[in-house]
């Protein structure tokens, strides 16, 4: 058959989404796993790895996957009980009364806009967050109720603070609000943090800091703690509690990353308040979308030589777009090459 339709069922009756795809190249796949004459039958995995057709198979899978991303959902049109949809940059959020159904799509955002769609990215983000939510609930409770699908999380509703808490351990970044960008322009006090002269890009800070932002016209706007309180965005007690939890989460994330050969460079947290007044962690935790990760083993030498650290986050995509266009001002952006995705 030239095409098939894959149905992903949310367990518990939450919903159904359909993704159509066209898996070309079945001959190459079949050839890759068929043993030659005189060869003993090996496992499917070994046959694929050792096959002379391996590269053909990988290319078929890659090309098929790129055209079959989960870029849009409309569950509110078909699932009873979902009364409305809010489309975020990456997540489609459905109102289900006392709960929210959050579908993490494959959309890739940066510079406050959508850049591309990346196969299986939504699943990676959702399952990464769930892993961290489970391991950080001793630091702060979270809103997660269940995960009926690899791309879906059901969460408790709460009153969301209109402030994002960005925790940073290094002077780095390429966006307009990144610490290196503002530092390189001469800022020495950023979001209430006093920074010394003489720092260079990708240098480690003497201690972790918070650089809160708030939303204005779909853009992140840096704010100081005093501005947050004066503008009524948070009470002083809520801000102090949340900022303490954010730094504790970041320190724990850095510790776990270090144990796995990584550096958690910076990240973003969002919090809300439950009906009982308790603070809850929401949205996502320590994902490659909300965080920067570097390879720890190569960082010292690359830093000394003035090279960009090896990263496993979306910084490579940011850098590509920055070198090929103005992602903040250009109305139409170039398509990212398939090899990059």
Curated annotation (Swiss-Prot):
<protein>
    <recommendedName>
        <fullName>Phosphoribosylaminoimidazole-succinocarboxamide synthase, chloroplastic</fullName>
        <ecNumber>6.3.2.6</ecNumber>
    </recommendedName>
</protein>
<keyword id="KW-0547">Nucleotide-binding</keyword>
<dbReference type="GO" id="GO:0005524">
    <property type="term" value="F:ATP binding"/>
</dbReference>
<dbReference type="GO" id="GO:0006189">
    <property type="term" value="P:'de novo' IMP biosynthetic process"/>
</dbReference>
<dbReference type="GO" id="GO:0004639">
    <property type="term" value="F:phosphoribosylaminoimidazolesuccinocarboxamide synthase activity"/>
</dbReference>
<comment type="similarity">
    <text>Belongs to the SAICAR synthetase family.</text>
</comment>
<dbReference type="Pfam" id="PF01259">
    <property type="entry name" value="SAICAR_synt"/>
</dbReference>
<keyword id="KW-0658">Purine biosynthesis</keyword>
<dbReference type="InterPro" id="IPR018236">
    <property type="entry name" value="SAICAR_synthetase_CS"/>
</dbReference>
<keyword id="KW-0436">Ligase</keyword>
<dbReference type="InterPro" id="IPR028923">
    <property type="entry name" value="SAICAR_synt/ADE2_N"/>
</dbReference>
<keyword id="KW-0934">Plastid</keyword>
<keyword id="KW-0150">Chloroplast</keyword>
<keyword id="KW-0067">ATP-binding</keyword>
<comment type="pathway">
    <text>Purine metabolism; IMP biosynthesis via de novo pathway; 5-amino-1-(5-phospho-D-ribosyl)imidazole-4-carboxamide from 5-amino-1-(5-phospho-D-ribosyl)imidazole-4-carboxylate: step 1/2.</text>
</comment>
<dbReference type="GO" id="GO:0009570">
    <property type="term" value="C:chloroplast stroma"/>
</dbReference>
<keyword id="KW-0809">Transit peptide</keyword>
